[in-house]
């Protein structure tokens, strides 16, 4: 799954002009899979999904649901979810490095009447999970362990009620609980008790999709969500293109002064990555909506910038690459992203290490990065088994000849086609 040989990042000596089609949203795909599984588990019937992303993260979610006894049929991006929660003996869920599997599936497993063990990649064992497990214990679910590996011992039902949780390390703690809340006997009220919540738009996505499944959710009070018990409606889900994956391609237009068009860009989306457009416009880029496409025309030059990425932390590696390639001497400040230290890798440490390895100037702050743009030199860019880090290295390689990404295969986590799409884009033939 990971490349053994370093990947020479394509260099673009002239502006990139290309049209790119990116596959479905990972965030939406894994939420639709869980919602479809819950509807089926309630005996409401099967659901279908069109446009599903097929990547390591989504395949791990499919395998997790199958481990729980549910059926996920279909090939490619067309899926059908049916069945009930009936795990076999010694059921074991492999979370890999997928935060959505790690945090969305345990509440679902709590509805089982059998023990289910969770484990994952070595790096996943450092990802925050204890607050979610403590929340499940607070709801009466027996859980052994404070991190991977751990075991959820369901009793066939969860009473529900009110739970307080510090989700300042990950909004997925809240989303994971909310997704299963309507299947709890008394529903669920989640109260966030910690400091400012990161990636709040991802919780808004969860709430919107729950409502689309017929669930009554009250989010009228800040940092509190009430999910009333009830049936989840089986339905057809149509997954949008993954706007977060599209960001790297849009960044290519900015750093080369070219034009990149993304097909199928939704007119109205709850995906937080849509906020990248505001950032790109501050960099003197021109953004156009043309029919169902989004087109970004990059500037001749752009200077450093200040941006709070608290709600869109997933964009940080791509935005950091943009900052490193700004006009020499200009300074960018990326804030609101302390929680990235608990992602696939410590992304703040990784970004500062890799930018500085190539001769850049990147310093960590308590909640972000300060990047002073300086001419970069060729060299190796480590991905740390992190898909976003690998993509950031590809962006840098567009303007710095001789950059090699040590593990471009890490992009298989959310976009297995990335190396091909990227190369085709640089050649101007992607579509």
From Swiss-Prot:
GO annotation (BP), single: amino acid biosynthetic process
InterPro entries attached to this UniProt entry: Enolpyruvate_Tfrase_dom, Enolpyruvate_Tfrase_sf, EPSP_synthase, EPSP_synthase_CS, RNA3'P_cycl/enolpyr_Trfase_a/b
Cellular component GO terms, alphabetical: cytoplasm
Catalytic residues of the enzyme: 314
Residues the entry annotates as binding 3-phosphoshikimate: 26-27, 31, 170-172, 199, 314, 343
Entry's EC annotation: 2.5.1.19
The protein's enzyme class: transferase
Keywords of the record: Amino-acid biosynthesis, Aromatic amino acid biosynthesis, Cytoplasm, Transferase
Subcellular location: Cytoplasm
Superkingdom, taxonomy of origin: Bacteria
PROSITE patterns: EPSP_SYNTHASE_1, EPSP_SYNTHASE_2
Sites where the protein binds phosphoenolpyruvate: 26, 99, 127, 172, 347, 388, 413
Record SUPFAM superfamilies: EPT/RTPC-like
Pathway given in the UniProt record: Metabolic intermediate biosynthesis; chorismate biosynthesis; chorismate from D-erythrose 4-phosphate and phosphoenolpyruvate: step 6/7
Molecular functions (GO terms): 3-phosphoshikimate 1-carboxyvinyltransferase activity
Reaction(s) the record says it catalyses: 3-phosphoshikimate + phosphoenolpyruvate = 5-O-(1-carboxyvinyl)-3-phosphoshikimate + phosphate
Oligomeric and partner information: Monomer.
Family: Belongs to the EPSP synthase family.
Role description: Catalyzes the transfer of the enolpyruvyl moiety of phosphoenolpyruvate (PEP) to the 5-hydroxyl of shikimate-3-phosphate (S3P) to produce enolpyruvyl shikimate-3-phosphate and inorganic phosphate.
The protein, known as: 3-phosphoshikimate 1-carboxyvinyltransferase
Organism this protein belongs to: Mycobacterium marinum (strain ATCC BAA-535 / M)
Gene: aroA
């Amino acid at each position: 799954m990971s490349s053994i040989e370093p990947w020479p990042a394509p260099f673009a000596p002239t502006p990139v002009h290309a049209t790119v089609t990116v596959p479905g949203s990972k965030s939406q795909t894994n939420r639709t899979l869980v919602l479809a599984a819950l509807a089926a588990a309630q005996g409401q019937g099967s659901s279908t999904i069109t446009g599903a992303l097929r990547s390591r993260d989504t395949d791990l979610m499919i395998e997790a649901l199958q481990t729980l006894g549910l059926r996920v049929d279909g090939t490619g991006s067309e899926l059908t979810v049916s069945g009930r929660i009936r795990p076999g003996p010694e059921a074991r869920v492999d979370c890999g490095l997928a935060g959505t599997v790690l945090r969305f599936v345990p509440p679902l497993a709590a509805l089982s009447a059998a023990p289910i063990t969770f484990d994952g990649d070595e790096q996943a064992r450092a990802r925050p999970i204890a607050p979610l497990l403590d929340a499940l214990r607070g709801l009466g679910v027996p859980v052994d362990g404070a991190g991977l590996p751990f075991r959820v011992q369901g009793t066939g039902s969860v009473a529900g009620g009110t739970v307080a949780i510090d989700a300042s390390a990950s909004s997925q703690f809240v989303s994971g609980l909310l997704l299963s809340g309507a299947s709890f006997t008394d529903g669920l009220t989640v109260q966030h008790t910690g400091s400012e919540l990161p990636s709040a738009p991802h919780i808004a996505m969860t709430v919107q999709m729950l409502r689309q499944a017929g669930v009554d959710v009250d989010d009228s009070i800040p940092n509190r969500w009430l999910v009333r018990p009830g049936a989840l409606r089986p339905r057809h889900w149509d997954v949008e293109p993954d706007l977060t994956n599209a960001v790297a391609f849009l960044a290519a237009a900015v750093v080369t002064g070219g034009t990149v068009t993304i097909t199928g860009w939704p007119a109205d989306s709850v995906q937080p990555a849509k906020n990248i457009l505001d950032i790109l416009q501050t960099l003197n880029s021109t953004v156009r909506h043309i029919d169902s496409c989004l087109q970004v025309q990059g500037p001749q030059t752009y200077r450093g910038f200040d941006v709070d990425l608290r709600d869109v932390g997933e964009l940080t590696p791509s935005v950091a690459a943009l900052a490193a390639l700004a006009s020499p001497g200009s300074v960018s400040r990326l804030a609101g992203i302390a929680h990235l230290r608990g992602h696939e890798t410590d992304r703040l440490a990784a970004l500062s290490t890799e930018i500085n390895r190539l001769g850049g100037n990147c310093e960590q702050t308590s909640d972000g990065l300060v990047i002073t743009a300086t001419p970069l030199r060729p060299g190796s860019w480590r991905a740390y088994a992190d898909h976003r880090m690998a993509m950031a290295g590809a962006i840098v390689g567009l303007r710095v000849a001789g950059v090699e990404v040590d593990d471009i295969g890490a992009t298989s986590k959310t976009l297995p086609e990335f190396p091909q799409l990227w190369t085709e884009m640089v050649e101007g033939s992607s579509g």
